Amino acid sequence: MKNRQLIQAVDVHAAGEPGRVLIGSGLRVKGATMAEKLRYCEEHLDDFRNLILHEPRGYPGLCSPIVVPATDPSCDFGMIVMEQGGFKPMSGSNLICTVTALIETGSVDVSEPVTELRVDTAAGIVTVRAEVEAGRAKSVTFGNVPEIGRASCRERV
């Protein structure tokens, strides 16, 4: 039987939360911005999301970030998150999984003892700092995008 699509995935975890990072999905995710890429995934790739996350390949607790080209030239890569309930613009644990996988597979330029990256997400640009030793990510921290939920809620009251 011929393979119709080859997918490169790395299974990692962030504090025990599993992530299957797709570093070579072969997907052509269209969009001029990360928000457009997210919308494209929602409209065209839900069957693919189910293929990766549901049995027999996946399981209920699994999430899967997709590494895509960044739309902002200042960023090192882009990320879209597939969760059981759909596609999400950003997830901290999935970001940690993605950065760990990319560092440990040599998919991004690594500087020891600290690697700094900029990640393009549909929620905005996220800055990441990874402590690296012997090619392994020892810790990953990030400065997330601003929260808008509280301000929006206050304005409604």
Regions flagged by a language model, labelled:
Residues 1-146:
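A glycine-rich beta-to-alpha transition motif near the start of alpha/beta enzyme domains, typified by
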Residues 147-157:
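Residue-level detector of conserved catalytic or cofactor/ligand-binding positions
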